[in-house]
Amino acid sequence: MASSCCLHAILLCSLLFITSTTAQSETSFRPKGLILPITKDALTLQYLTQIQQRTPLVPVSLTLDLGGQFLWVDCDQGYVSSTYRPARCRSAQCSLAGAGSGCGQCFSPPKPGCNNNTCGLLPDNTITRTATSGELASDTVQVQSSNGKNPGRHVSDKDFLFVCGSTFLLEGLASGVKGMAGLGRTRISLPSQFSAEFSFPRKFAVCLSSSTNSKGVVLFGDGPYTFLPNREFANNDFSYTPLFINPVSTASAFSSREPSSEYFIGVKSIKINEKVVPINTTLLSIDNQGVGGTKISTVNPYTILETSIYNAVTNFFVKELVNITRVASVAPFRACFDSRNIASTRVGPAVPSIDLVLQNENVFWRIFGANSMVQVSENVLCLGFVDGGVSPRTSIVVGGYTIEDNLLQFDLARSRLGFTSSILFRQTTCANFNFTSIA
């Protein structure tokens, strides 16, 4: 009998030791970075990702919003979690999120998204430009770690802040999507929360695949970043330009004196075939009303130009693309061509390069045919820029198509953008991150 008791005691101690060691290992593990796979939806051209959220964990599909303020999800339908916690008025969470001192009240039984004495924000569908009020809350989020080259173990943030949206906000988003993942310049965006929780640098990189059948990637944390076949991108592989803060929010709804969470860069001029395009350069600056300038966006599928800039760029491009037959326009594009006489290169159709000249003549973002020309039918290629109208809020919006197969690093601590131009030159693509090999 004594022998049996001893055996049970030994087994119990062993089990406790294993459990304790496992828990300690999970607690002490600090990932170098994190990754999110990104897919391109063929119907909407939105860039989608997926996280695991709640308890028990469930997969949540989201539209990627580079300049979005935070993670928001639909809490009206099917949100069930034992670890959901609404943020109470005047709490540290509300202060961190910039939610102000107002207190929300709910006039129905408590549930996720509807609790008394909570603070709220304004979840924004940036595709349809629709916003509403929503409850700030925290819950468990699980994502995969990475060393910049391979995926690693899954890690959890048990107090990840997000905002509850309403079901009607999902209108216009891709099928199956339950919210939006905001990577913008706020203290509760995904990059900010991940870097704070896991103590890695406040940097993230975006590499969007041009294919609807292959995954691109967002990498949170510092580089180097590696793509197959062993193409490494370190700090000296990037060109750098400052990121600017627009002092006036560009969200659909916002509070006074709230700056924009989107990423603006300082384009000084535009060149085609290394020749300056004559444009009104005052449009390239942000005025005191927050109008003008250049931003980068993943919710706009194509680059959008203010009308006078669009006309100048289109006309100049047509003039430089000699001996190519122009054909009828195909909406939303104006300048379309017979592609049968346009040669192919490693970086797409052989057409004039377009340069966004940045802080000086030696720093420019060169756009090649793969990112400027859209194949709209078998024999028709169109210049993939869109007329944004006479008085848009932002003069140039660099859209998703233009940044596909470009590696962009957003350094939040130093407020700068690192960019590579097309990585097709390096004989790789954004679809070549090795998601299959576990670090």
Curated annotation (Swiss-Prot):
<dbReference type="InterPro" id="IPR021109">
    <property type="entry name" value="Peptidase_aspartic_dom_sf"/>
</dbReference>
<dbReference type="Pfam" id="PF14541">
    <property type="entry name" value="TAXi_C"/>
</dbReference>
<dbReference type="InterPro" id="IPR032861">
    <property type="entry name" value="TAXi_N"/>
</dbReference>
<keyword id="KW-0964">Secreted</keyword>
<dbReference type="Pfam" id="PF14543">
    <property type="entry name" value="TAXi_N"/>
</dbReference>
<dbReference type="GO" id="GO:0006952">
    <property type="term" value="P:defense response"/>
</dbReference>
<keyword id="KW-0732">Signal</keyword>
<keyword id="KW-0645">Protease</keyword>
<dbReference type="GO" id="GO:0006508">
    <property type="term" value="P:proteolysis"/>
</dbReference>
<keyword id="KW-0611">Plant defense</keyword>
<comment type="similarity">
    <text>Belongs to the peptidase A1 family.</text>
</comment>
<keyword id="KW-0052">Apoplast</keyword>
<keyword id="KW-0378">Hydrolase</keyword>
<dbReference type="InterPro" id="IPR001461">
    <property type="entry name" value="Aspartic_peptidase_A1"/>
</dbReference>
<comment type="subunit">
    <text>Interacts with the Phytophtora parasitica xyloglucanase XEG1 and xyloglucanase-like XLP1. Possesses stronger binding affinity with XLP1, a truncated paralog of P.parasitica XEG1 which has no enzyme activity.</text>
</comment>
<keyword id="KW-0064">Aspartyl protease</keyword>
<feature type="glycosylation site" description="N-linked (GlcNAc...) asparagine">
    <location>
        <position position="280"/>
    </location>
</feature>
<comment type="function">
    <text>Involved in plant defense against Phytophtora parasitica. Contributes positively to Nicotiana resistance against P.parasitica. Binds the P.parasitica xyloglucanase XEG1 and inhibits its cell wall degrading enzyme activity and its contribution as P.parasitica virulence factor. XEG1 acts as an important virulence factor during P.parasitica infection but also acts as a pathogen-associated molecular pattern (PAMP) in Nictotiana species, where it can trigger defense responses including cell death.</text>
</comment>
<feature type="glycosylation site" description="N-linked (GlcNAc...) asparagine">
    <location>
        <position position="116"/>
    </location>
</feature>
<dbReference type="InterPro" id="IPR033121">
    <property type="entry name" value="PEPTIDASE_A1"/>
</dbReference>
<feature type="domain" description="Peptidase A1">
    <location>
        <begin position="47"/>
        <end position="420"/>
    </location>
</feature>
<comment type="function">
    <text>(Microbial infection) Possesses stronger binding affinity with XLP1, a truncated paralog of P.parasitica XEG1 which has no enzyme activity. Is impaired in its inhibitor activity towards the P.parasitica xyloglucanase XEG1 when hijacked by XLP1 binding.</text>
</comment>
<dbReference type="GO" id="GO:0004190">
    <property type="term" value="F:aspartic-type endopeptidase activity"/>
</dbReference>
<dbReference type="InterPro" id="IPR032799">
    <property type="entry name" value="TAXi_C"/>
</dbReference>
<feature type="signal peptide">
    <location>
        <begin position="1"/>
        <end position="23"/>
    </location>
</feature>
<keyword id="KW-0325">Glycoprotein</keyword>
<dbReference type="InterPro" id="IPR033868">
    <property type="entry name" value="Xylanase_inhibitor_I-like"/>
</dbReference>
<feature type="glycosylation site" description="N-linked (GlcNAc...) asparagine">
    <location>
        <position position="434"/>
    </location>
</feature>
<dbReference type="GO" id="GO:0048046">
    <property type="term" value="C:apoplast"/>
</dbReference>
<protein>
    <recommendedName>
        <fullName>Probable aspartic proteinase GIP2</fullName>
        <ecNumber>3.4.23.-</ecNumber>
    </recommendedName>
</protein>
<feature type="glycosylation site" description="N-linked (GlcNAc...) asparagine">
    <location>
        <position position="323"/>
    </location>
</feature>
